Amino acid sequence: MTKDRLAALKAAQSEDEQDDDMHMETGNAQYMEEFFEQVEEIRGSVDIIANNVEEVKKKHSAILSNPVNDQKTKEELDELMAVIKRAANKVRGKLKLIENAIEHDENQQGAGNADLRIRKTQHSTLSRRFVEVMTDYNKTQTDYRERCKGRIQRQLDIAGKQVGDEDLEEMIESGNPGVFTQGIITDTQQAKQTLADIEARHNDIMKLESSIRELHDMFMDMAMLVESQGEMVDRIEYNVEHAKEFVDRAVADTKKAVQYQSKARRKKIIILIVVTVIIVILSLWLIQYIPGI
């Protein structure tokens, strides 16, 4: 009687443990599903930023190729830059939340958890992609600054004001567009148009520098994170690639084994049939030619 009760208690405990394991697996599966939904959302946001960066490049070219001040295109450019800034800050915030969650779970579970490794790899991949896009955006802005600076230099030359590169840089950094008009006679329409273009390019540079400063801290934070993760990601990618090669090789070997096994099985069947036929023939021969059988 006691043994029966003990067995029943063990069975009940085993069922409870199985239920707990099932609930834990279900919870983990749901968490990972939500995690991958978040990953796809972030990836989509980064792709949108990348597309907007390409649009910014087009606006830059349109502004510089237009001999007159194109206010509409500039407003569209300003809006694009504002959209990129908002989206970049959101992406950075979401990546930071994932990073904090990973660190918390790593302290609780250890680094050997399979789901945790998957999350770390996804986070690293997203971070690297984000930094690539923002690096391209930063380069786009600095290139545009240099092109605006070159445009100012050419317009000053046209106006008869010779300025060296260092002096021009100081004039730009002063933030005062009036420094460009000193010593220039503006009694013709052409001269006025030249100065208007210089002031417009100078304003563009001021906006660019403000935008670059606003994104600088975020950019450096993400760049440092990616650099620290680079070795880990490369190692994971190496292991994944070699694991894939191993699996491919194992699949090929398995196929060969199945083929060999199938051929061997066919040979056994053929041999068995041949032996059976021989036995039947011998039996018939014995019955026919040996009396008493």
Curated annotation (Swiss-Prot):
Residues on the membrane's Cytoplasmic side span 1-268
Q: Name its cellular compartments.
A: Cell membrane; Cell projection, Axon; Cell projection, Dendrite; Perikaryon
Q: Does the keyword ATP-binding apply?
A: no
Q: Which PROSITE patterns match?
A: SYNTAXIN (PS00914), T_SNARE (PS50192)
Where the record annotates domain t-SNARE coiled-coil homology, the positions are 195-257
One GO term (biological process): vesicle fusion
- List all topological domains (Extracellular): 290-293
Q: Which is a Gene Ontology cellular component entry for this protein?
A: basolateral plasma membrane
Membrane topology category = Single-pass type IV membrane protein
Name residues in a coiled coil. 69-95
Question: Would I find Transmembrane among this entry's keywords?
Answer: yes
Q: Which keywords describe this protein according to UniProt?
A: Cell membrane, Cell projection, Coiled coil, Cuticle, Developmental protein, Differentiation, Membrane, Neurogenesis, Neurotransmitter transport, Transmembrane, Transmembrane helix, Transport
Q: Where are the transmembrane segments?
A: 269-289
Q: Which SUPFAM superfamilies does its entry note?
A: t-snare proteins (SSF47661)
Its main localization is membrane
Q: Name one GO molecular function term.
A: SNAP receptor activity
State the SMART domains in the record. SynN (SM00503), t_SNARE (SM00397)
> What Pfam families does this protein's entry cite?
SNARE, Syntaxin
Checking PANTHER family in the record gives: SYNTAXIN (PTHR19957), SYNTAXIN-1A (PTHR19957:SF424)
Q: What does this protein do?
A: Plays a critical role in several secretory processes, including cuticle secretion and neurotransmitter release, and probably assists in neuronal membrane maturation or the final stages of neuronal differentiation. Plays a role in synaptic vesicle docking and tethering through its association with unc-18. Through binding to unc-18 mediates the release of the neurotransmitter acetylcholine from cholinergic motor neurons, and thereby promotes locomotory behaviors. Essential for embryonic viability and development. Has a role in dauer formation and adult life span. Required for locomotion.
Family statement: Belongs to the syntaxin family.
Q: How does it assemble?
A: Interacts (via N-terminus, in open or in closed conformation) with unc-18; the interaction is direct. Interaction in open conformation with unc-18 promotes synaptic vesicle docking and tethering. Interaction via N-terminus with unc-18 mediates the secretion of the neurotransmitter acetylcholine from cholinergic motor neurons. Interaction with unc-18 is reduced in the presence of unc-13.
The protein here is known as Syntaxin-1A
Native organism: Caenorhabditis briggsae
